[in-house]
């Protein structure tokens, strides 16, 4: 059971990462080209939000089922266990919170520039935090 959930978490990560990168690039392009914020731009950001939240939910299941997750919290001297039991989940949760804040803030804004700027900042920071603690070794096994 654990292996299936772990593979789902790893596989979905590629899709969630791709959509999030598209959303960040789209927001920077919109900001710097001074284009109007359209329904297409909103949907790109929404799909990134939904994809990354789905990844979070799958990650919670993995965290509590995995021998490398919650049960390994007492072994902070081991860098690999610390990454999977503390650093990866914590930084990803913070990154996803920033992405969620960006989504919530954009709804109150009225100008295209402010919406693109908000997505660029919050989604961009969220992406940076997520990228900082991905266990890259397991991505390319």
Predicted regions and their residues:
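Membrane-embedded alpha-helical bundles that constitute the cytochrome b-like, heme-associated redox core
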Residues: 1-141
């Amino acid at each position: 059971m654990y292996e299936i959930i772990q593979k789902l978490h790893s596989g979905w990560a590629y899709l969630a990462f791709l959509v999030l990168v598209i959303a960040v690039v789209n927001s920077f392009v919109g900001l710097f080209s001074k284009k109007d914020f359209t329904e297409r731009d909103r949907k790109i950001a929404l799909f990134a939000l939904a994809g990354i939240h789905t990844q979070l939910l799958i990650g919670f299941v993995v965290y509590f089922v995995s021998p490398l997750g919650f049960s390994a919290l007492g072994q902070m001297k081991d860098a690999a266990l610390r990454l999977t039991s503390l650093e990866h989940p914590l930084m990803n949760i913070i990154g996803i919170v920033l992405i969620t804040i960006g989504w919530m803030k954009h709804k109150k804004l009225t100008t295209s520039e402010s919406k693109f700027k908000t997505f660029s900042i919050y989604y961009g920071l969220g992406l940076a935090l997520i990228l900082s603690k991905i266990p890259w070794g397991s991505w390319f096994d």
